[in-house]
Each structure stands twice: as structure tokens, then as C-alpha cells.
């Protein structure tokens, strides 16, 4: 199958030939050193934002709200270049997904993020994991000593899910040694590192609705 055919089938292999890591050929992201705090808005809200140079864009939202960035990468790269920074897209890796789908979503997160970096976008790596067996590949392609982003949303509802989150978090600290962690959601007291906390998107959305109501 030709690259043109792969492009038509939506695999985006034509975006570039990037350095890769691990047995699954995950594109490698370059480290980013983010010293100043950035106000982050979710991708679907960013589409309507006029003051784009004041914000960063995150993807801690449902996949269907940002799949368009995968299906039309050049168009949305031009759009995202207008913001201060962008997080790598958080394609879902749910535990009930087949392992092949989990790895594919990790790969396309990096394929798109590496492309964004190649066109001059400041990309903060979003770190995610599934179960303990995902540790063998879920950190592939992530830079060492970089600012990174994580989200604890949905991981603190049971002892088991909280324990798994902490195990993955500690594995992240050990493997990629992030210099700063942009953290969305509740921060468990056990989490170490240089953490910059941000409220999850649903809390900021609630505040936005309340503010809009007051203005009426």
C-alpha cells in the first residue's frame, strides 16, 4: 500500500519521518521547558476563542471532540500555532480496549504531536498509562527532563484505580524525570515532583456558566 493510500485511510504517515523509540516505533517528542504558568482551555472551547495568544490548549476531553485534529492535521496545525502552547492529544487508552488499540492511540498521539513540533508549535507531552503491563510501552517517545501534563480525572474513585494511578505516576517520575508536571484534577497527597495544579475542565466549565449567568 502506498503512502498516498495510507493518507487516504487516515493513518497520517505522510506527516513526516520522525525519530522513533521502542518496539512499536513511537515518534519521539522533544523536551519543553515551560517556566511560566499558562491558562489552559480545552480544544473544543479554543475553536471559539478570540484571544488565542493568551492561552494553551489541552485535550482532556472526550475523543470525539478533537478527532477532527487527527483527520485534518494541516488545517488544525495552522490553528493551534496561534496559541502559547498545546498539549499532545489525549487519545483514550481505556483498560477494556484491546492492547493493539491502546498502543495505536499512544502512537497517533505522538505522530500528531511530533508533527506539531516540526511546524513550530510548543507541545507539552501528555503522559498516560493503562495498567502495569502498559509501562513497557506507554512512556516510549516521551522526553526526559521536560515539562509534562497528566490528569487524575476519573482515577480517584476507588482504591484500585487510585493505586494504579499512583503506580503509573511514580513510574513516570522514575523513567522520564519530568522537571515540571502540569496536573489536572485532584492531586493525591502521595504525588511528588514539581507540580503545577489546574482544575479539571468540568470545574472551569461550571465557573464559566456561573459567570455568564451573572452577566445576564
Model region roles, listed by residue range:
Residues 1-32, 193-216:
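C-terminal accessory extensions appended to soluble enzyme cores
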Residues 44-51, 62, 69-213:
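Eukaryote-skewed repeat-based solenoidal scaffolds used as protein-protein interaction platforms
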Amino acid at each position: 500500500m502506498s503512502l498516498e493510500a495510507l493518507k487516504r485511510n487516515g493513518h497520517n504517515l505522510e506527516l513526516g519521518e520522525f525519530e522513533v523509540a521502542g518496539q512499536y516505533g513511537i515518534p519521539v517528542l522533544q523536551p519543553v521547558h515551560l517556566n511560566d504558568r499558562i491558562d489552559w482551555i480545552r480544544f473544543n472551547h479554543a475553536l471559539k476563542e478570540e484571544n488565542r495568544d493568551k492561552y494553551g490548549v489541552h485535550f482532556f476531553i472526550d475523543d470525539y471532540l478533537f478527532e477532527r485534529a487527527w483527520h485534518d492535521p494541516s488545517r488544525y496545525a495552522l490553528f493551534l500555532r496561534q496559541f502559547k502552547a498545546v498539549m499532545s492529544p489525549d487519545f483514550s487508552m481505556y483498560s477494556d480496549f484491546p492492547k493493539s488499540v491502546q498502543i495505536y492511540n499512544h502512537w497517533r498521539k505522538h505522530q500528531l504531536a511530533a508533527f506539531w513540533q516540526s511546524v513550530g508549535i510548543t507541545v507539552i507531552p501528555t503522559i498516560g498509562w493503562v495498567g502495569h503491563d502498559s509501562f513497557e510501552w506507554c512512556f516510549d517517545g516521551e522526553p526526559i527532563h521536560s515539562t509534562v501534563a497528566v490528569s487524575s480525572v476519573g482515577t480517584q474513585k476507588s482504591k484500585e484505580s487510585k493505586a494504579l494511578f499512583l503506580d503509573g505516576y511514580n513510574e513516570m517520575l522514575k523513567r522520564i524525570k519530568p522537571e515540571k508536571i502540569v496536573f489536572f484534577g485532584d492531586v493525591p497527597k502521595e504525588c511528588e515532583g514539581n507540580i503545577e495544579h489546574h482544575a479539571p475542565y468540568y470545574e472551569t466549565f461550571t465557573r464559566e456558566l456561573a459567570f455568564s449567568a451573572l452577566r445576564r
